Each structure stands twice: as C-alpha cells, then as structure tokens.
UniProtKB/Swiss-Prot annotation:
This is tRNA-2-methylthio-N(6)-dimethylallyladenosine synthase. PROSITE patterns: MTTASE_N, MTTASE_RADICAL, RADICAL_SAM, TRAM. Keywords: 4Fe-4S, Cytoplasm, Iron, Iron-sulfur, Metal-binding, S-adenosyl-L-methionine, Transferase, tRNA processing. GO terms for molecular function: 4 iron, 4 sulfur cluster binding; metal ion binding; N6-isopentenyladenosine methylthiotransferase activity. Residues 172-402 form the Radical SAM core domain. Its EC number is 2.8.4.3.
Length: 471
C-alpha cells in the first residue's frame, strides 16, 4: 500500500500522456535542452529526472546554449551567494531570449520555494517562462506544455510537501555510478537552515521501491550507488514497522552486481550503534562517513539547534574509528554564526585538530530570510568571518595533506571512473574512502575494480601505479 504522500498513478499517467504528446509534436525535429544545476547532490539527481523527462519528450542534450530550445536552471537556496549567482545568470540569459524568442526558460528548485524570489521573477524577469519548486517536478511536462502553447509565464509553486514520486524517467550523468534518493526533506530545523522550508518534512521511500531501483541499476551495469537524503539516518521513521537505515543497508548489500554503497548526509544525533556495526560488517558499504559537525562550541551548537554536544560528537568519532579503523571522515563547518566569539572559534579549531578530518566543506555563515538565526543578536562582522574561514581552511588543508601522505606507498582498491580531465593518458579512479587517484592505464579498464599503488599525494587527489585488475 502506498503512503498517502505518494503522487497518484492517475497523475503520473496524465504526465506521461503529455510527454507523449510533446514527443509527437517534436517528431522529425532536432530540438535540444540544457540544464544548469546549483547546489547539492539532491539537486543534481533532480536535474537527472528533468533531463529524463525532456529526453522522453524528444529533446537532446546540448552544451551550446545558442542551440537550446529549453533552458532550465535548477537552483539552491542554502546560501545567499548561490541565489545571487542564479539571478545574475538569469539576467544574462535575457539576451539569448531576445535572439531566440522561441526559447523556453525555466527555473526550478529550492529558490522557487521562497515567495520573495518568485515575486521577484514575476516582476523583474518576464523572459522566464516556467517557475516551479521542489515538490512538483513530476508536473514539468504539463508546465512545459502550457508554456509552449500559451507563451505566458507559467508559475506553479506548491506549499504541499507531501509528494514522493516513483517511476519518472532519469537520464543519469554516469553509466557507472548512480544517485538514489531514499528520503526527502528534513525535520531537524537547524536555526540557520532553510532546507525544511524548501524541501519539506521527512518522507521516506518504501524499501521495495529503493530495492527495485538498485536492482535495475545493477542489471544495467552500474557498480556504485550513493544513497541520498538530507538526513539518511532518519530513514524509515515515518514508515512504521521494523525498517531503518541500517536494515536498508543490509538489504542493498545483498544485491548482486553492485560493488559499492555510499550515503550522504548523516546527522550526528541520529548515528546509532546499529548503523556503525552495519558499516563495519557490510562489505559493499564504503569506509567513508560524511558527518557535519558545523561548530566545535557547545554554545554555538545549542544556538544552531543541532541537538548534540561537542563531547557527544567526539564520542561518535571514537566509536566509529574503533570499529572501522581505516575510515575517512569528512564534515561541514560554519564559521561566524551569530554570537560566535573568538573563544568559540578556537573550540572549533581544537575539535578539527582532535578529529583530524580527511576533508571539510567550510563556509561563512549566510543569513537566510525566514530562519531563526537571521534575526539573532550578535551577528558577526563579515571581515571577522573571512578571517576565521581562512584560518580554518589553512588548518584543514594541513591535516588533509598529512592524512593523504599516510597512504603513500600503500596499495588501495579503486573503482576506475573514466579518463582524467587533466591528462588524457591517465585514468581517474576513486578509493573506497572517496579519494581520487590518477594513474596511467587503458580506457578499457573503465568500470573495473583494481589495486593501485599510491606514488604521490595531495590533500584529496593522488597519483598511483596500476598493480592489478580485480574484476
């Protein structure tokens, strides 16, 4: 039985019929699309779904914007900088529309769940044809049909977040690695974060739907999957019964053909012993954990509403490493959160020193309208934020270099992903700990697992020599 928040078969049938109608209209024509994606892996996967629908409708992908008949921007709202970039880009595209009045321009994603952004587009960007959000991607064929036939701006942003969609066509960016959504939305409401407002509350996919998708990927030759969610550790809580994220990993580990399983992102407050033991015991689950800490000060963590302490986070790290000694741990850190003093920042630096992360995504706090942190007192000056970010990056780069140097001379297993973009004579591959290794090899090895000896190391990329092909 479907959960109540699944999109109905009748609605999906309607969209499929519209796709067929547009494909019929496009028969015998050379029509093209281009998608620009901003933000997280969830957005990347949403863009794969949009691309899949466009190709079902007869469009072909192009990098040449002058050639495009449909141009989509899939947007991110996590930081103000991303919004500024998108709106600047949309302004630039007006000239393209002037040269090609038949071009359909669409904007989707998290930014479109912000009312003030939608109003700005309505008032200042009349050259944009379609506006839709994160909850009704499945309606894109209908919105495109309206835009093609009415030539008036189509805005369809819904507040209803209870929409999980199965069965949409997907044009994946790789034929080797695949993103697989397992849970949408977030219930955590960190005070700085806009995601619960743009992506909605947590909604888990049914395990049978996830298993069916991964089995299909295995049959098509995919070797690696990355399970996606704002908080994968919450998977299954809304489904009832005896399913959780650790149990899902056990189910997926049994699927033949899949060689590697990754996942992101995990919330520290929801890391369980059961999950740690699953990561330890399941041979396909890679030794890499992305565990955002955000700050090293208990005062700041409380203001962020992260619902764990510095001490609890360090306990998790100790337990993970005790069970999985060779694991790579990465994180997210925000500097300059409202109320952060120099002492608070020193506590963050101290935590980074103690944990010795393999890598970190570091950011200056960005005020997001509508979040509690935006109206907090003691906002930190931008120059102070920049100074702290530089110091944090310098420390983390030093640690990342030292961690990578420990691998020099060792033989590691890699999945060979393709030809190096910098050197056509080399292949690019990835270790189980998610580090990139380049080495000389033939293109026929792409898609294979191999052992490579590390000969040179940098912070997150390495050079190596092929030792043996495994399978």
């Amino acid at each position: 039985m479907r959960n109540s928040y699944y999109v109905s078969e009748e609605e999906l049938k309607k969209q499929r019929e519209i796709m067929e109608e547009i494909a019929w209209e496009n028969r015998g024509k050379e029509v093209y699309y281009h998608i620009e994606t901003y933000g997280c892996q969830m957005n990347v996967h949403d863009s794969e779904k949009l691309a899949g629908m466009l190709e079902e409708m007869g469009y072909k992908y192009t990098e040449d914007l002058e050639k495009a008949d449909v141009l989509l921007f899939n947007t991110c709202a996590v930081r103000e900088h991303a919004e500024v970039r998108v709106l600047g880009r949309v302004s630039q595209i007006k000239e393209l529309k002037n040269r090609n009045p038949n071009l359909i321009i669409g904007i989707s994603g998290c930014m479109m769940q912000e009312k003030h952004i939608v109003e700005a587009i309505r008032e200042k960007y009349p050259h944009v044809d379609i506006v839709f959000g994160t909850h009704n991607i499945y309606k894109f064929p209908e919105l495109l049909w309206q835009a093609l036939n009415s030539r008036v701006q189509v805005i369809d942003v819904i507040e209803n977040t209870q929409n999980v969609i199965e069965g949409l066509p997907i044009r994946r960016d790789s034929n080797l690695k695949a993103w697989v959504n397992i849970i949408y939305g977030c219930n955590n409401f960190c005070t700085y974060c806009i995601v619960p407002y743009t992506r909605g509350r947590e909604k888990s996919r049914r395990p049978e739907d996830i298993i069916a998708e991964v089995k299909e990927l295995a049959e098509k030759g995919y070797k690696e999957i990355t399970l996606l969610g704002q908080n994968v550790n919450s998977y299954g809580k809304d489904l009832g019964g005896d399913i959780n994220f650790a149990k899902l990993l056990y189910m997926l580990n049994d699927i033949k053909g899949i060689e590697r399983i990754r996942f992101m992102t995990s919330h520290p407050k929801d890391i369980s012993d059961e999950l740690i033991y699953a990561m330890r015991d399941l041979d396909k689950v890679c030794e890499h954990l992305h565990l955002p800490v955000q700050a090293g000060s208990n005062k700041i963590l409380k203001r962020m509403n992260r619902r764990y302490t510095r001490e609890h986070y360090l306990e998790i790290i100790d337990k993970v490493r005790a069970n999985i000694p060779d694991i790579a741990i990465t994180t997210d850190i925000i500097v300059g959160f409202p109320g952060e003093t120099e002492e608070d920042f020193f506590q963050t630096l101290d935590l980074v020193e103690r944990v010795r992360f393999d890598g970190a995504y570091t950011f200056m706090y960005s005020k997001r309208a509508g979040t509690p942190a935006a109206s907090m007192p003691d906002q930190v000056d931008d120059e102070v934020k920049k100074d702290r970010l530089i110091r944090l990056i310098e420390l983390q780069n030093k640690i990342s270099l030292e961690k990578s140097a420990e691998l020099k001379g060792k033989v590691v297993e890699v999945l060979i992903e393709g030809v190096s973009k910098r050197d056509p004579n080399k292949l690019t591959s990835r270790t189980r700990t998610n580090k990139v290794v380049h080495f000389i090899g033939d293109e026929s090895l792409i898609g294979k697992l191999a052992n490579v000896k590390i000969t040179e190391t940098k912070a997150w990329t390495m050079q190596g020599e092929l030792v043996e092909v495994l399978r």
